């Protein structure tokens, strides 16, 4: 009999994983403060990593990688992409981005040097001079010059400003209490018809204890309810696809897709009929490349292969597609929720791939092979 503890009562994903484990008959749930467990389903920001793996005779597994915030906080992701040897030269799939600290945080400003970007060795270097240099260059050359400011730890569409005015963007950040990212806004996104609407794509990615990377075969488009236009950046319902914003502010929420969600099968049908292309060849190949590039760049820093405990983690990668069918990484979520209809299959995949590979069920050899819900990258 294997044992597990649950330290995060708010995760719907791990509530389902917990239910599935108990249903096998091979797992027993212990009190949350019991140190002698095989598996911890913990809180992402409060995990006692230093105390894991020290119980004699027990292999211990935890559902997060220590250090994964390098990918999952917006400012850290920008720094990773600019400083990682694997990404700095070859990354063409991440929008131009700058890390900006509010002036009240007393952060040193990195001076622009002929447009050449110095490495971000300091963890607290403000890049506003580089942003302004790029902004002014684009303005002189008549390029699209719309940017989006986002709180590094923000979620659900909070702490966001879209503007073509550099002063407005910097003033907005300077009145906040935390680091932000200013990122080039994708002004020409691929739009869904009918409705001329924006969307983003959520893909779920599972990394097991050996740092094998698995992409969940299903994904979801989060769609806007209102037509996309560039003449009013304050109209969040046409620019931001977050469910909470669409549900709260758009009278057309749910008009085109139930819950403003389109799944991959429907999206593939749309691409085939509207553009004569397939999801796999036009978009998923790019998504797989981006996911693998990001995760391989952090593997040396976060892998648990030589530690006394093991980790796995579910990530949510968010993408946008422009009108040229180029895929752009927007952000990575380290504790993603899941579309309601996908919970059972996604969570069963977590049990089968990430947990049973470390703690195999006693009857593993008699169990029939399961259909591939995750694709190994």
Swiss-Prot record:
Documented EC number(s): 6.3.2.25
The keyword Ligase appears for this protein: yes
Gene Ontology molecular-function annotations: ATP binding; tubulin-tyrosine ligase activity
CC cofactor: Mg(2+); K(+)
One GO term (biological process): microtubule cytoskeleton organization
Cellular component GO terms held in the UniProt record: cytosol; spindle microtubule
A Pfam family of this chain: TTL
UniProt keyword terms in alphabetical order: ATP-binding, Ligase, Magnesium, Nucleotide-binding, Potassium
Domain TTL: start-end pairs: 3-370
InterPro entries reported in the protein's UniProt record: TTL/TTLL_fam, Tubulin-tyrosine_ligase
Reactions listed under catalytic activity: C-terminal L-alpha-aminoacyl-L-glutamyl-L-glutamyl-[tubulin] + L-tyrosine + ATP = C-terminal L-alpha-aminoacyl-L-glutamyl-L-glutamyl-L-tyrosyl-[tubulin] + ADP + phosphate + H(+)
Family the entry assigns: Belongs to the tubulin--tyrosine ligase family.
Self-association state and partner proteins as the record states: Monomer.
Role: Catalyzes the post-translational addition of a tyrosine to the C-terminal end of detyrosinated alpha-tubulin.
Listed name of the protein: Tubulin--tyrosine ligase
Record organism: Bos taurus
Name of the coding gene: TTL
